[in-house]
UniProtKB/Swiss-Prot annotation:
Protein purpose: One of several proteins that assist in the late maturation steps of the functional core of the 30S ribosomal subunit. Associates with free 30S ribosomal subunits (but not with 30S subunits that are part of 70S ribosomes or polysomes). Required for efficient processing of 16S rRNA. May interact with the 5'-terminal helix region of 16S rRNA.
Name of this protein: Ribosome-binding factor A
Provenance organism: Parasynechococcus marenigrum (strain WH8102)
Subcellular location field: Cytoplasm
GO terms, molecular function: ribosomal small subunit binding
Protein's gene: rbfA
Subunit-structure text: Monomer. Binds 30S ribosomal subunits, but not 50S ribosomal subunits or 70S ribosomes.
């Protein structure tokens, strides 16, 4: 099980260093067009491959541009991670857009809309946070 802990530790370090590099290291203007958040990092068991999930605030066009910038910077990022983490061979880095936050916001919006509709029909008393007993 020590192998699993090592992979988790490396993933946490990659997340930390990548966050730092997104702020100070990557100079590509496309990357700085939207607010980029790292949501998750997955590292393969042999530490040779790394998938970084990012959430990007902005419209679809700016998200695509930021993703292009991140993919273009993946070689630089691989070199910096190898140097900073002092790994013999740095993992190949792939960025993937994480739409989980968008989906969550959409679901919350739908739930709020449903609650408003139920209040209008009188199914839920206005100002009540509790669901009616069935």
């Amino acid at each position: 099980m020590a192998q699993g802990r090592r992979v988790e530790r490396v993933a946490a370090l990659i997340r930390k260093e990548t966050s730092e590099l997104l702020i100070n290291g990557i100079r590509d203007e496309r990357v700085h067009q939207g607010m980029v958040s790292i949501t998750n990092v997955e590292v393969s068991g042999d530490l040779q491959h790394c998938k970084i999930f990012v959430s990007i605030f902005g419209d679809e066009a700016s998200q695509l541009q930021v993703m292009e910038g991140l993919q273009a910077a993946s070689g630089y990022l691989k070199g910096e991670l190898g140097r900073r983490l002092q790994m013999r061979r740095a993992p190949d880095v792939v960025f993937q857009l994480d739409r989980g936050i968008e989906r969550g916001t959409s679901v919350l919006g739908l739930l709020n809309k449903l609650e408003d509709e139920r209040k209008e029909r009188g199914e839920i008393p206005a100002g009540s946070d509790e669901l009616p007993a069935e």
